[in-house]
């Protein structure tokens, strides 16, 4: 079996839609075959695990994936605003701890202690938040009874057992979009933010201390992984967060998102995961303050799940070169045992998705114009039924069409190769 070949994008011509003006056939779907998951820049998490299994240390792992960096302790106790709810119209918050208290304040009160709550939420009650015009409307719900609180642009909620409010250690739940997560630390802010096309939407942030309250809840790799891999991830995650801290983004009311667009923040469930959570917490604690730096400043320590056999540089992926990113061999990403889901993958993309990616009415042909040395697509060109041509960076195409990676080839088209047959069982 071939261990590495930047893999494939196959066009399905089984169903076609004739155009009104010409005989050009418009494919209904595009079948995709490739390798790796994510942008491939920086540390490969699958590669880090493989190196840890082989006995390498966290320092050795990080030094392999990041060029000319220093690993040194920095003060990482700053407070982060982590977005935990984006572009919402409503959300629900409740306390799941007996005798814990929950209080709501009008405004964004920061770290202030000399503030008076506008309401104390009774036990077995919840706080519901709804966008109302350009404001947020909170209501306290107890059983079937709902009491509204005067609207405001932003509210802060605190609960007992945190840095902000003494008392019984509380754990709160936050529910939106049919998903519930639990939070133990910091405080939550609920703000109405104006968007370009949707009007006002609800943005929810969790203000947490980076060094522990935040990092304990980061969920980027399984906590069951080897210690060195967990420590390498803890240092990379700390470094990435340090590079974002204090750079406020109005669109999310945050320093960074709690999703994979920055890095995944699961909250309290990560450190309390049965059987494994304490291992991740230990990895964070045992690497306290350790940060990847150049010239004394934290780097943007990019990482992704896996590559197509070679990692990618930031310049190739996004157009802005970062000297500490480099393309290095990452053959573990192509190991079906270590990377069973993404050593090779197959997807089907709709015509609508591809044409939307290129902002064209339709796409009848795709052509890879150039490839990077890593095997990722540098430029991919689309042609519409009217003959209009547009090009995209390969990483942009990946992001817009939601395929796993930019390591692919075209099949059955202008500069195509034959598809790789599926491995025998």
Regions picked out by a protein language model, each given a short descriptive name:
Residues 2-425:
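Conserved, single-site charged/polar hotspot
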